[in-house]
Amino acid sequence: MDDRLEKIAKVNYWNGNRFDSGVERTWYLDRIIPYTGNRVIKVVTGQRRAGKSWLMRQVMASMLKNGVMDPSQILYVNKEFYRFSFLHTTDDLMDLYETYCREINPDKKSYVFFDEVHNIPGWERVIDSLSQDPSIDCEVFLTGSNSKMLSGELSTLLSGRYIEFEVQPFSYREYLRTVHSSPSRSTMLDYLQSGGLPEFINLRGEETKRHYVESVKDTILLRDIVERYNIKDAALLNSIFAYLVNNGTSLVSVSNVVNYLNNEQSRRNPKAKEKNYETVSNYIGYLTDAFVILKADRYDLKGKEILKGAAKFYANDNSYHNYLFDGFGFGQGALLESYVYQAVRRAGWKVYVGRVQNKEVDFVCTDHDNRLYVQSSWTIEDEETAEREYSALESIDDSYPKIVVTMDDIARKNRNGILNIQAWNLEDYLVKLSARYNIIQG
């Protein structure tokens, strides 16, 4: 066998190898599997450590189990693994594929799974060739940790011949399956504290957990952003990340961030050069491209349009709040709001923040002609808080679903058609609503 194939055989299925594929992520499998069996490229994106590689293994396992292919038909390439360090150029990549076809799978269709292969310059043309060359019988799956992998040359080459699936950290329901528990206020409190990074959940000891979250953050910032964009000021990037994570429930503009950074800098070093708007704006864009920060634009309910300027920015996982920035006052209500945003977005909605008659609507959620309006409040047991949350939704003059999500032990009765959903029941509600509106969940 070719030396390169011997190196990578241990992470492939050719010799009867079987691999642990973790907690089955049925939401994503139910979306991806129906798109198999054709030349459409399946692209799995999402932040690092969200479980993309595990999901790829689950897709392979599902297809093997259902007899779609046999082990020799799979070629798995993970550019993050040292055993693939011989891959430097597109010629290396194509030569590996051709050698695999010659020695392992000469007669049947190939299913090629590329993990983080976008680190090879010019990789787009290899993907285009494998998926479109009529002399090659091949189906391609990709993962990537940056939303921009689908822009530029790849988008031009493929021109609609791909479908993207964004993977997020474990949902609350997936978390429950991992810890073998059931929905309750207690388990929701645990989830709000831990977040949903798959490998984090089984860690023990607060210091171990903190170090893990720190390493995930550093890897994303340094490898997916600093190295990719040749950033000179990694400390500035980290400061912007910290600011956005800890202001997730407030409207934030680029100017807000610039002013904060310059004020902090002038206290420490009055002679230092001020941060400029363009640099800060670019860095914020890099953070959202890497999926570690999620952006919720403002939506004008009266004019029915997306507004430019200030927006809300949420961390992609609550562990960033809880294990990296102890010095910031990030309360329970903010953790719940972050979770609600993540859950609704994961359920397939486009999520915005809105106002109506000078009242704040936490989330305006859209999917084509469908709408969902959501308020998030830790408790509405006192009448003043309940009035604030309900009155904003009552000011919206349409018949789309409206809900208030809380952590209250006892849910309030419906008020003018507005439901009070306890946080631990939110995802079940969203599943039913998505089925009603035929929304594809993420």
Task: Walk through the language-model features, giving the residues of each.
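A short, basic N-terminal segment
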Residues: 1-38, 285, 442
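Interdomain motor-coupling "hinge/lid" segment immediately C-terminal to the ATP-binding subdomain
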Residues: 2-8, 145-147, 151-251, 255
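Hydrophobic anchor at the beta1->P-loop junction of P-loop NTPases
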Residues: 44
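Walker A/P-loop
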Residues: 53
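Accessory nucleic acid-recognition modules appended to NTPase machines
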Residues: 73, 205-370
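Short glycine-rich substrate-engagement loop in P-loop NTPases that contacts/grips substrate
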Residues: 76-107
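Conserved catalytic/switch belt of AAA+ P-loop NTPases
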Residues: 124-141
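Domain-level recognition of nuclease-like catalytic cores that cleave nucleotide substrates
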Residues: 409-442
